[in-house]
Structures are given as structure tokens and as C-alpha cells.
Amino acid sequence: MDFMQTQTCQNLARSFAGESQARQRYTQYAQQARKEGFEYLARLFEQTAGNEQAHAQEFLEKLQKYGRQPIENIDFSAGYPYTLGVTMENLLEAAKGENEEAARAYPAFARTAREEGYADAAAL
């Protein structure tokens, strides 16, 4: 089957978009924490934003490895949070999102990748 038609392709695209958006959210959370005087939390959010950027890069590299080149567009439908509150709210939202990824989304994506024959994508 053409990779571009697989669920793994869709999941990698969702993951790339999600990690990219998470990076931006964490960058904004850092600004908010700094504004509230929480320098340690601001640095923690900035470090987490950097981690999300690295994750996004890994997903993009897998898309480029398997997809037809150049990949001009991948259509998919997904929901992403658009929250920005005070630092305590941002911490709770971050924990909620990271838990959702770790407990549900990424294990399901990995299972699908293995089933479709993309073991290295499953290992992300």
C-alpha cells in the first residue's frame, strides 16, 4: 500500500502538527510564567518547548522517509487545545495533554505503525 494512504501517515502528520503546536503553547506558557514571576517554571516550559520541537522533527523525518517527495500536503482532521491561562492553569493543561499523548494517543499510533509494517515509526 502507498504510504501516503496509510493510517501511519495520518498519525505521523497529526503527531508533527501536535508537537509543533505544543512547542508554541509551551513557549507562550513560559512567557506567562515569567510575567507572573515564576522564572524557574518559565525555564522549565522553555526546555519542554525545545523537547517538543525535537519530537516534531522526528515525526517530520519519518514522513519524509516514507512519503513521496516532495510532500506537498497531508489532509487530516484533528483537535488541538488552544488554551492560555495563568501559570497554574497552564501547568494543568500541559500535564493533561502530555498524559493523553503518553497513555492513549501514541500507544495507539505505535500499534497501528507496527501493524502496517513501519516498526521504526512505532518506536518513536
Question: Which functions belong to the PLM regions below?
Answer:
Residues M1-L124:
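Non-heme di-metal
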